[in-house]
Amino acid sequence: ASGETEEALATIPLLSRSDLKREVEEVSQEEEKVQGITHLSYQENTSGITYLNLFFTLYGLKAEDVPYAYLLTTILGSMDTDNHTYQELTRISNTYTGGMSYAITSYDDKADNTKYVPVCAVRGKALTSNADKMMQLMGEVLNHTRFTDTGRLREILMEEKASWDMSLFDRGHALVMMRLMSYYSPAAQFKEQGSLSYYYFLSDLLEHFDEKAEHIKARLAETAAKIFTRKNLIVQEVGLKEEKQAVVNHLDAVIGDMPEGEACHTLSFVFPETGINEGFLSSGKVQYVAKGGNFVKHGFKFTGALRVMETILRYEYLWKRIRVLGGAYGAFTRIATNGDALLCSYRDPNLSETLKAYKELPEYLRHFNISEREMTKYVIGTMAPAETQLTPSMKGERAMVMRFTGQTHDDRQKVREQIIDCTQEDIRALAGLMDSVVSDKYFCVLGSEDKLKAESNLFDHLRSLTK
């Protein structure tokens, strides 16, 4: 198409904004108490499959427990329990379920980056006729895992560390984005405990494994006991009446042996400070360069126009400045409704040039000017991801996101309308907001040791990436 004239391109049929659906879908789930536990049902035809999600809130943990909570999710299902070897657990899971997973995650408040809901999410799916077997397995793993086998523990830690070592550089952008946001966002600081900080925690445990083994086993058992209590639990299933009934009927298999625990609803984590503006030295030849800040702290508000701006930056400014001129594989933005925002380049041969491109971005927005046809294309391109068909489990997850973040139907409706009605003036009006983000002092880079050392005056700290 690059050889075509503007006139020829303009003859290609294009949707108009009036073709876009303005209404967002209603999202609701039924809520009741079952044996004193909050039970949510997301009604959706799942063709006889029960999707079961157990959310254990982590408010009762201390900051120093959090790395052990992340470690725990790697260990569950991979160590023996009171009644089964870990090989048997795998066999039972493969026979009767479509898979089970354990993960620490958090849901950030829609407006305030100091608030979030930290959870351990235990997810499983099974044919509804096997829901009882799946729930027995969950109960066994959550309530009866034995953390006593030192040899097996070392094996799991070594596998986990090896997998981090292999993927460290490839997921460089994810690591620097999380590390960067942890400088200015308490919500991101929690997630960062499962990112680069977790890799360093893991490395330290292995390095001192012989003297720390007993301590590690005790901490894992204590952390599991603090997390897996009835008071922390919220149950959600996705399905119809049969699925709901199966979960209610067999809930005892999960909670029968689970202690009541203490109710706790306040966040009190204080994580160790890492310092800011770090450069992580690696043997690779390219950089991941991230810069960001929080615009709500500077008095700006999130609007749907930011989503359109992200599309425009991806295909216009960042594409041309950082990919075409700079030679990087790519660059992208992350903007959250709570004001946490960042720019990040991917496999980038440059460093200070990229930071300069970020700094000059607001100026580009101030003078933003394209044809109405192009603008409509960007609006349609922004809407496309929202039109993806969701699977039943994805719909269930969306309902949980809304519940935990405080996002309402009206919030979603408003953003959708702001996207569809977005004008070039709206994009130009974002220059001040983006200026506040790129003028904040925060950045983080992972890249070539030579390159970072040559520009070491940029950084507050240079650290070796691998341990």
Go through the PLM ranges and name each one.
Residues 148-152, 261-264:
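Conserved short beta-strand edge segments in small beta-sheet-based binding/regulatory domains
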Residues 216-251, 439:
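Non-catalytic, conformational "gating/processing" segments within enzyme and secreted inhibitor domains
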Residues 65, 244-257, 357-359, 453-467:
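Surface-exposed flexible segments
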Residues 27-28, 38-42, 218-226, 232-234, ...:
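Generic recognition of flexible, low-complexity loop/linker segments
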Residues 421-467:
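In a subset of proteins, long, contiguous C-terminal domains/tails are tracked
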Residues 35, 211-219:
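Short linear interaction motifs
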